[in-house]
């Protein structure tokens, strides 16, 4: 980026796609994180689902760690707002992780599995997220809280499934979104298509490729 002259005008985002080791092998990691493999629990497995999300912004002199809970669907809205993009009219899911109104409920695909700052539900067990202590006999108030969180988490998943598997975009008519024809998209010849766009844009192209006179920075 520095050699291409883009570093000072780039936001760099690093995100761990998913955990790297299966639950059956997780206890072997216990000594590395000051845990005991003999007392390893589903809570520990859930905590190892965490992945890094790091953002470097031009001009940022001092970084910090922000403790908030989110998922992959929150990455785009967060980045949009860092760029100053108003996403109110965008058809998308997810929330800005930096927003005070961010609902910190992380839903897992496994049935009734979720994590919030207060509770962790994993493999049929409930834990205090802050201490890792299992909650075996929740009182009436806690049970009501858990049910509300479980409902919200399941709603997230149902909405996502409805959009993707039900192809709900076909019913959306806002923002002049036209019908999408799959045949119009061919990613096999992406380079050829991009060069055609560059040629069509001519002097109006703002890509790095054009600015370098048709020379790649790679």
PLM features: what roles do these ranges have?
Residues 1-218:
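Solvent-exposed soluble domains appended to multi-pass membrane proteins
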């Amino acid at each position: 980026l520095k050699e291409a002259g883009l570093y000072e005008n780039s936001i760099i985002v690093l995100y761990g796609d998913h955990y790297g080791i299966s639950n059956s092998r997780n206890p072997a990691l216990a000594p590395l994180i000051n845990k005991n493999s003999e007392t390893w629990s589903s809570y520990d497995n859930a905590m190892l689902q965490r992945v890094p999300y790091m953002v470097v912004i031009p001009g940022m002199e001092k970084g910090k760690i922000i403790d908030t809970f989110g998922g992959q669907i929150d990455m785009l809205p967060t980045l949009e707002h860092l760029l100053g993009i108003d996403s109110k009219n965008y058809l998308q899911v997810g929330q800005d992780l930096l927003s005070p109104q961010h609902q910190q409920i992380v839903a897992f695909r496994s049935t009734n599995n979720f994590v919030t700052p207060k509770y962790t539900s994993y493999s049929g067990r409930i834990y205090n997220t802050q201490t890792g202590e299992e909650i075996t006999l929740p009182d009436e108030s806690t049970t009501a809280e858990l049910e509300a969180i479980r409902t919200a988490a399941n709603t997230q998943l149902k909405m996502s499934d409805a959009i993707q598997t039900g192809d709900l975009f076909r019913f959306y008519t806002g923002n002049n979104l036209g019908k999408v024809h799959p045949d119009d998209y061919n990613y096999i010849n992406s380079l050829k298509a991009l060069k055609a766009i560059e040629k069509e844009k001519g002097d109006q192209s703002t890509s790095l490729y054009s600015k370098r006179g048709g020379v790649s920075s790679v």
